[in-house]
Amino acid sequence: MNRILLTLLAFSGLYLASCNSATPPPVTVQDIPFSGGEGTSLPSLSSDGTQLLLSWVSTPTDSTAQFQFARLGEDGTWSSPEQIAEGSNWFVNWADYPALVQNKGSLLAYHLQKSSPGKFSYDILLHALPKGETNWRGGLPLHRDSTQTEHGFVSAAAYTDSTFLVSWLDGRNTGGGGHDSHDAHSGAMSIRAAEVSLQGQVIWDTQLDAKTCDCCQTSTAITSQGAVVVYRNRSDREIRDIAITRLLDGAWTEPSIIHADGWEIAGCPVNGPKVVAQGNTLLVGWFTAAKGAVKVQFSFSSDAGANFGAPITVEGQGIIGRVEVALLDEQSGIAAWMETNKAGTFLMAARIESGGKMGKRWEIGAMDSGRKSGFPQLEVLGDRVYFAWTEVKGETNQVRTVFLPKAAF
């Protein structure tokens, strides 16, 4: 073979190698057009491993609220909105919002409805759509007391094949004193749980803790050993750290603190925890400002919540919190939180591992730092990680949904 031919072959090989090693296009956050339009807020994402649902509240007028949802299709777009309920006497709050959960094709949703003209009196109403049915069974009571007090901050999860496990903050012992009442005649906010059928009927309910923080979200998950509920506790010394209680062999354990932050604060920070489960793995995220150190923390448990590892921490005065978590497998997950820097306020997300490692921090999207933006949402389905939040556009709001490939984390 002559030298010219050898030279040509060599250059051809180099050319092909350079083509094969071309830099792939950059990974970017991808928008999913929202089907609900403007005047929408308070999104909630729900995945059962096969289907992703998005719920939200639409306010066509100042006095009317519509609870709606959509399904993510195989083509990656949202379906037309379907209505769950509508009302003019609802309690609609930026931190205490309606949501829905799935159980093998059956749906359970909930919203808050005022029980009196008072500011701090509202009830939790359930809406059930059993698999195969087309009409929602609505307006079903969750709690069995008739006190005109606060009931809210609901969380729920599929429990058995035929039931859901629901937890909530319950003000029946407060006497209607409002948030953080120190009136001598007012009792404390408590947390309760109930098992609810696919038809929306309460099977049993019980008190989990007689004294909790008044207005931080609860969070519920199901491990291989049973249900867990995570919430912000409140001690007699006003220490408000994150607690967990577990349903084991038919009995709830005494609440225990996940990590002793020692956050002493006289009022509610309106910044609750989030928990997710897979097998015996738990991942919990929460906000704290103990001793003036503002941070979000994330901790894994490998024994269904009996013990937790050292927290993975993101610290800084710009940390807002409003955490979200999702598991990728039994050793890793996605953590999300809100954070303000010199460029603005953003929803941030990163991969975290049970060994303590945190990966690249992704800037998912710009957010309003105030209450209007609500609490961002996170779910993993298939090879994508989905996010939702309320985008503030001047005087109006609109739900925004985006995704990143799971491989980006």
Show the residue positions of the predicted features:
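Extracellular, repeat-based ectodomains that mediate carbohydrate processing or recognition
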Residues: N20-F409
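Sec-dependent N-terminal signal peptides
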Residues: I4-L14
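C-terminal motif of bacterial Sec signal peptides marking the signal peptidase cleavage site
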Residues: L16-S18
